[in-house]
């Protein structure tokens, strides 16, 4: 609801909507694909985290090829979510959370709170990656695996904070790290697959299992499924890609890449080494015209391709990690019952390289595993700063009084401290699973709301009208995604509770 204060309308921060009209500016010209490559690979780098390195291998080692027949289907669903996240930001220059507040304040704040719950446990990614450094260095000498893991986690968290503070442009820090991580991870796995005799022996069993529903029928769970693995099951679905809150961060990478109307919005820059760029409290929109329509098609075609690069790259990474698992780690599980766990969460996967190159190979895997997981923490830290700043920027008066980047860097610092505390409290696997379950719930909710936000509300409030509305093809595939995610989460609740 809105109230009248001193003759002026003051919007409600709880019961109303964020209704500030967009500024009107010209839709920028599409600069070409070479200039715009980045957000899709960043998304792939983030996605190549716990699902790809830990939980998909866990499920394949324990249950064989059953879940592989869902892999391509799982992965494809997130494509349509990313598309709609990017569409809103490209059309308005606003981050996706401003869009949530335009749907309704209650919805916006609810999504903000759930996202912050996810962020409380994000230190688990650093401690998961630190299990690899602990195994590689055996330092500090005389400490047990838990102590060494926590030591390296604390060191990594501090170093990452320093990199953030000194990096001139926040997005560039994330982009460089994620592109490096994506190619190191993918390249390392590909080399191991191509050289491994064990992989060649199982290829005839493995690749047919990737055909959707070949190995599972239409059953979501195998007959021998252990109900204790339901947290892993739902995390697996959420993280066959970025998942939940992490998907929403795609909005900010597209924005800082200056895609479409986001080119009129400033980037987050370092308070020490960067020059301030203006970030307004309201987005910008273009008006309808034949020329704008044609230019918008170019921007959306780029997004279809850019998004596809990220999804395909991440899916291929899962194929590589699960192929190595099926060839090398599943026989070991059948013989010994060994699975990734505790403070040696990444140590188990060292045999992917170890069976080829011995201790040198295991050492390389530890480094690759560290990149797999710590890059996710870097991206999440950036996401925390943007999420808090974007939500606060929907509050009247704050954009005029406080710089967006000041909020961002204060939040990055606060969550750095939180991360340093949480890695001392629980084993890394537990922390990551806590984020997975919450992210699945977030994804179920916003996927359904996108039908209203982008198909109904956006064309209504945007000066370009139906030009920015998604097509019926998108509607169909988004509906499939919403139904599937909802059913999966309902199955999780049914089995768990």
Question: Which ranges hold each PLM region?
Answer:
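C-terminal membrane-solvent junction of multi-pass transporters and transport-like membrane proteins
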Residues: 177-180, 386, 390, 400-410, ...
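Flexible loop linkers connecting adjacent transmembrane helices
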Residues: 15-21, 55-60, 82-106, 131-141, ...
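Extracellular loop-to-transmembrane helix junctions
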Residues: 31, 58-83, 98-109, 151-152, ...
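Hydrophobic alpha-helical segments and their helix-loop junctions in multi-pass secondary transporters
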Residues: 184-225, 243-251, 447-462, 488-496
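Membrane-interface "cap" regions at the ends of multi-pass membrane proteins
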Residues: 1-53, 263-264, 271-284, 291, ...
